[in-house]
Amino acid sequence: MRTIAFKLTVLCLLLITCVSAGAQSVISIYVRPDGKTDAAGSIKDPVNSLLQALVIAETKVPKQPKSIEIILREGTYFLSNTLEITKNSGWTSKVPLTIKAYKNEKAVLHGGKIIKPELLKQVTDQQYASRFLPEVRNKIRQISLDDAGIANIGKLRTFGFSRPMAPAWLEIFVNGTPGILARWPNHGTVPIVNVIDTGSIPRWGDKSNRGGTFTYAGTNRPSRWKNPEKAWISGYFMWGYADDAVQLNKIDTAEKIINTKGPAHYGFGNGKPWRAWYAYNLPEEIDTAGEYYVDQDTRTLYFMPPDNMGKVEISELETPLLAMEDVNDITLKNLYFTCGRGMGISMERTNGVKINACTFTNLGMMAIFMGKGVKPDDLSSNEGGTPTSRTAGNIVQYMYDHSTYDWESGKNNGITDCEIYNTGTGGIYMGGGNRLTLEAGNNFVENCRIHDFNRLEKTYRPGVWVTGVGNHVSNCEIYNAPSVGIFMHGNNHLIEYNNLHHLDLDADDMGALYFGRNPSEQGHIVRYNYFHHIGGQHKTMAVYHDDGACGMQVYKNVFYKAGTVAGFIGGGRDNPYTNNIFIDTKFAAHIDDRLKNWARAVLDKDGLFQQRLELVNYNKPPYSVQYPMLAKYWEDDPATPKRNTFSKNLLVNIKQRAEGHAEWLPFLADNYETNTDPGFVDYENGDFRLSKTSEVWKKIPGFEAIPMEKIGYQKRP
């Protein structure tokens, strides 16, 4: 017994020593909004800013090479400039750094101002007040932006498909809810009736900057607008995948004719249900809670508050709230990023940075931008530009035009357990890896909830934009957006265990997951995902292999009410669909030979595909080794879709198995189609796991169960 007691005593002492050593291996620096500038940074004597905490951390590294944690106490930390954690600003990355909130407290990094209640006043200019509708006139309040300390009130700009991304204009948030620039109609759009002049069309090379002219009908509402030349219109003016926004020039309210100051990217059209517009930036249209208008001349904000008005915030900072560059081994945890006109976090050339359990909301751009963007030469054009830090700009078009561009996203960076919502231009933009060597970036987005991420720009501003090589998106719930959930470029990406739903709600000819137009971008795997409730009134897809896309394996996914077409293959090859479940969708798949007809120009000699293939040396290692069929692309009749097989899939209540010619998408005999419940655990309530007695096990020998319970966002203990 004495021997046992002695051993236990020694063990306890060892444990105490280890715990003590562990505790001493971390230096803690505390921050509190009401702390002191010259404080020591202890829990009882905290500093008052993150910047000061970083200064203390930098001084401690040479003396005590231990891990450092900066702990933020509850409160709001206002940022008038970007907070920098960079090699140039002094962080050496010699020790791991963690920045986190204290226990369960809420630490907010804020890029704007919280407006004091006494600054919210009744409208004093009665002549101006007469512009408001009589029924709401007494409810509208005004804020002097000078009194609120807002120096830069911003300005509206063109935005939309193939236009550069840029910081938003001044925005107001009431009770955490984004305000809306006063618009009409409050919901929906007004059809374009007839097009008198489509205007110049920048997309097809016309740079004359001529506005368009079209007619509307059925309303006299514009006759109320005193200064229509200050108003803007937005909508899908030509194609249902291309939103746009342009300033008005004038309105003939008698003839119901609208003329715009500048051109729409694709010009104006009519005759399609999405070809419509709504007008905004109109003080006369403040008629619902949250609507606002900024008078640039008087620097006054007018808005209609809700009945339960609490906190009022105004965004101001146009640069990122936080920038990390040339640094390693940094962890951000339980932080709250909000109220910036630009992006939440910008990262460049980072390694091992982890962003965990953070919230990003009410931002004018995206939450996280992992890499270097492209500063546009012209804010209205998507052409050209210069790679630039801490910006987004023309990055989407630039990557399209320069498909091997390394935008310096770093490697081994991860975004986990975060929530992103109410952002203006998407969620997470992530690169990493080398498209010439196929070296993986190993960057990842895991277990995040990303929703309502297109407040301002509607198309091709996805929940996750993933480029480069060897990056992955897993266990994310991505939902409630007018267009794309995941937009891909590059090679060897893994998309798994995601719940993608209520996407493509407004757009036409778009997919919840989209990639295409580059046959060298291969090696992708899409598995164990749940695509459901995709699309609105127009043609949409769950997985969109656009314009000759090749080399994506799609297996063990569930597609339920997954748009018009669950898997849309636009002329490509080597896109097998295996062991998937398709339920209550018009077409399980689509196949066409567009590279033989309307899209054949991409195969021209010295054309787009030849340029993109030769850029990566497609017929030499490593491409010829990883993708052996690609090495013979030109000898293998590239205009004909091939090797797009459909095997071991379950189709339940599908109106037609495929849209297109069967020889291009062979349905093998091991698929099973039925119009009745095949033995789901609970068909009616959406539990599409197969019961042990399901007929599928016999109908499709070798069919493997899809682990529905592992799909989507997983709550952590």
Regions from the PLM with identified roles:
Residues 26, 30-348, 354, 361, ...:
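Extracellular polysaccharide-degrading/modifying enzymes targeting complex plant/algal/animal polysaccharides
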Residues 1-26:
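Bacterial Sec-dependent N-terminal signal peptides
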Residues 55, 250, 416, 474-475, ...:
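A broad, structural surface signal
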Residues 82, 92, 343-346, 364-413, ...:
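Glycine- and acidic/polar-rich repeat regions and solenoidal domains
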